[in-house]
Amino acid sequence: MPENKIRSTTILCVRKSGKVAIGGDGQVSMGNTVMKNTAKKIRRLYDGKILSGFAGSAADAFTLFELFEKKVQEFGGSLSRSAVELAREWRTDRMLRKLEALLIVADKEESFLISGTGDVISPDEGVIAIGSGGSYALAAAKALYDHTDLSAREIVESSMKIAANICIYTNDHITLEEIL
């Protein structure tokens, strides 16, 4: 019997020299079949001041995007407050707890990973990644961050290409957004 689990994505966020960039690949796989190559998993929120990306179930992620956007509006664009409140609601709401997705959100000052278990994680070094190829992208980004003069955008581009060459659930159709 074929496996129908949907697997997808690598999302990488890098903050460097006052700039933040977030990138995501476009592949969506079901079992061992590529279903889509050009999915857009990166969004701008709050008049372009907040970047977000998701890994996991697309339907679940869009639900979380909507909830997060409401929190951002409710808390006047405060990224940290919105992230904490979304995680709290996600963890305690019976229906939301069943959603299978992870979010990375970032603005000009902060970046967070938000999970359904109530985790809100801010990276120590300005680099954070999620998804099936997240560990590959994270390793590449940390090496480039520490040992090159590349910009945040260039680090995301290079690291996502590396992840796409290693992870079978990640492709090289990259969507990239940045805040300068």
UniProtKB/Swiss-Prot annotation:
Primary residence: cytoplasm
Catalytic activity: ATP-dependent cleavage of peptide bonds with broad specificity
Sequence positions that bind Na(+): A164, C167, T170
Superkingdom of the organism of origin: Bacteria
UniProt xrefs under InterPro entries: ATP-dep_Prtase_HsIV_su, Ntn_hydrolases_N, Proteasome_sua/b, Proteasome_suB-type
GO cellular component: HslUV protease complex; proteasome core complex
EC number, UniProt record: 3.4.25.2
Pfam families in the cross-refs: Proteasome
Molecular function (Gene Ontology), one example: metal ion binding
Activity modulation comment: Allosterically activated by HslU binding.
Annotated compartments: Cytoplasm
Residues forming the catalytic site: T9
Coiled-coil stretches: none
SUPFAM superfamilies: N-terminal nucleophile aminohydrolases (Ntn hydrolases)
GO process annotations (BP): proteolysis involved in protein catabolic process
Top EC class for this record: hydrolase
UniProt keyword RNA-binding present: no
Keyword list, A-Z: Allosteric enzyme, Cytoplasm, Hydrolase, Metal-binding, Protease, Sodium, Stress response, Threonine protease
Role noted for this protein: Protease subunit of a proteasome-like degradation complex believed to be a general protein degrading machinery.
Family to which the UniProt record says this protein belongs: Belongs to the peptidase T1B family. HslV subfamily.
Assembly mode: A double ring-shaped homohexamer of HslV is capped on each side by a ring-shaped HslU homohexamer. The assembly of the HslU/HslV complex is dependent on binding of ATP.
Protein name: ATP-dependent protease subunit HslV
Organism the protein comes from: Leptospira borgpetersenii
